[in-house]
């Protein structure tokens, strides 16, 4: 299998720049509560508001902070059916894999896509309202891609942990 960044620039590997203790406090605080005002954040990390704001902007520009969003409860918005899908593709030349990656990135039902080692080439996380919608996604979208050779679906019975903050202890 050819290993390279995903088809979208969004996922390109960024060079690692040094984070100091204050930067680590800022990203930990924002990860815990992305709605903090700059004044609240500055107070939490021990800075005045102006330097705090500059640091946040730098962390955003350097790619440490990708964005801010509300985390929705899937079941409350009618997306209570989650499937983890292992996909094998035909051939592993860059152009074949890129076609698959570009197609999957455009599918709104796919909330995560990973290039993996092991039995599958890719592992997708798919969310839909119910089983019939997954069947429609599978037959009407995923299996219509000529590069897809095999699909193995694993239906989530219960979610014990999802959307957890990233562990940042190694940065300190």
Task: Identify the role of each PLM range.
Residues 1-172:
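A compositional/biophysical signature of low hydrophobicity enriched in polar/charged and small residues
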